[in-house]
Each structure stands twice: as C-alpha cells, then as structure tokens.
C-alpha cells in the first residue's frame, strides 16, 4: 500500500515543481507586462481584424453571409456574456470600416499587422529567439494569419453546419447528448486548433507538434475555465456596476482581454519549456557543453535570486555529475550550499571564456553544433578562435624549423 502512495506523492511533487518552474518562466519573461501591452494593441486591432475577416469571407461566394454568423459564434463562445453590449459596438465599428476608402483600409491593415509584430516579438522572447522574421518571410506569416485564418474558420463553420444537417450525425449527436454537447465542445476545439497553429507558426524557430499541442491544450482548457469563473464573478459580485454604471462593459472587456492574453502566453511558455527540456538532455552532450549548461543554469537561477537543486543537476548530467561539477567548484563558478543546492559563486563579468576553457579538463568539441540556443554565441566565439588558430598553425613545418635553426645559429 505504501508504494502507490509514494508514487502518487512523487508525481504530485513533479507536477508542483513543473508548475512552479512554469510560473517562474512566465515571471522572468515579464508575462504580465507583455499581456498588458498586447491588451493595449488589441484595442486598436480588434476592429481591423473583424474587417479583414468580413472581407476575406465575402470574397468567396460560398462564404457569403457567413461572416456575421461566424462573428456571433466566436464572440458568444469566446467572450463572456457580460461583454455583449461592447461586442455590438465593435460590430458596428466593423460595418462602418467596410465603407472606408483604400487609404483607410490600408491603415486598418497596418494596425492589424502591428499587432502581429507585437505577438511575434513576445513569442520570440519566450522561445529565446533574438531575431524576428524579416522581409518576405514576415509578410508571408502575417498574410497567412490574416487570410488563411478566416478561411479556415469559415470552412470549419460550413463543415459543422453541414454535418449537423446530416441525419446520421444528428442521430449520433442525440445519443451522445445532442447538439448542446456539440456546441459545448466546438469553442474548445476551435481555440485548441487556433493555439496549435499560433504556437507552431508565430515563433521564428522550429516548434515540435506535440509541444504545441501540450501548450494549446493548457491554454484552451484554461481559457474555458477562466471564462466560466469570470462569468460567475460578474454574476454574483456585481459591485462593478455601482462604480462604473453604464460604462461597466469597457473595464470588464479590458480585464477579459488581459486575462486571455496571459493564458495564451502561459500556453506558449509550456510549449517552449517542453522544447527546452528536450534539448536539455545534458547527459548526451560532450562534457565541455555539460559544464557550460550548468553555468548557464546557475546564471539563470542567480538572476531570479534562486539556487538550483542538487538532484536536478544530477538528473540532467547523469553519470558525469561528479566529473562535471568538480572543475566548476575548483574554478569557483559553482558553490554548493548546505541544503543540497547549488548557486553561482563568481561574477561571470570578470570570468573570460579563455579562462573557463583553460580550467576545463576536456577538449572543446568544435565539430559539434551548439546544443542549446543560449550557447550559440559561445559556440560562435570558439569557432572564430579556432579559425585564427588554424591560420597560425598552417605554416609549413620546414619553414618553422628553418626559422628556429637561424635563431639558434651564432
């Protein structure tokens, strides 16, 4: 009986530790500030997005008349009922925007693209990507989101309407709980699919499908739970109406948009964290890169004012744990505390890469690529040093020996 309890306790510890690390990542990347910035940008971009949605769906004869239904479906399923009044104003703004001139439409399109740029920068920061897309690649990404997104939503709406009209599907739906169950699963499915697409397409790096699925699942479930909790709060604690009166819908909508962006960013943090954990299988790295991985991990923890657990480093390093930590202790980079934790012991600003390389007992594996994104700059510096070393050592042996003989002669 004790063994299952120990296993359950171990899994609970792993889950709690993972949640703590996820929250720490979110805080380290200024998730709340980023969500605030995206909320501000959304205020200017929501009407252009609705206008683009209408324009794209109206351009295809099969989608005529779907845009209004699709907007109603999206807002009814993804926005709490408290924002219905504000949603009607947004629809009115979108209808008025359709009668703008070409210059006005271009301005709306630029506003929508600015929001995409902000989202891409936030995601690149989460995935530790220093360069954003430029030129044709960025244009293709934004064009795909602004065009394929509405088309896919319209196609999905048509498909769901068609399936709902089939006798066989309606019979199966009645057995499984009827159309109500289908409509309850529809927003979760739509948001999950959209998050998978966003997490894989927006960051300027390769994101594995299963990592995007994990992040999308967390974000979609959290969004549904948040929507229910938000609606309950507004229903049973209506004090906001006393304070804001008829303008109550505006701050509520802002809070909901902020909460939604925070959830989206948390899902992105999970997808990026899973990718980093996969790349952080240090036991398969060369010892030199393992030592650098330890230094990088200690440095990140030092910036957060924290220490690293001994068992975490042992799990990552595997059998080389003692061999890797010993020279780092001798160099003074890693210091072990009394509570089985490690912390950074030296100012890395006063430690050069040359001194670190000389202190390590292993050869630098220059033939290998950088094992992690945070080590790309160090890898590039080592390769540059190796190129200079090769230029010096490519002199013929005969020339060097003859030069030495001339210096030795009286």
From Swiss-Prot:
Compartments where located: Cell inner membrane
Keywords: Cell inner membrane, Cell membrane, Membrane, Transmembrane, Transmembrane helix
Membrane topology: Multi-pass membrane protein
Key word S-adenosyl-L-methionine present: no
Membrane recorded as keyword: yes
Main location: membrane
Pfam family, one: Virul_fac_BrkB
A Gene Ontology term for the protein's cellular component: plasma membrane
Transmembrane segments: 43-63, 99-119, 139-159, 180-200, 212-232, 247-267
Family: Belongs to the UPF0761 family.
Official protein name in the record: UPF0761 membrane protein Csal_1895
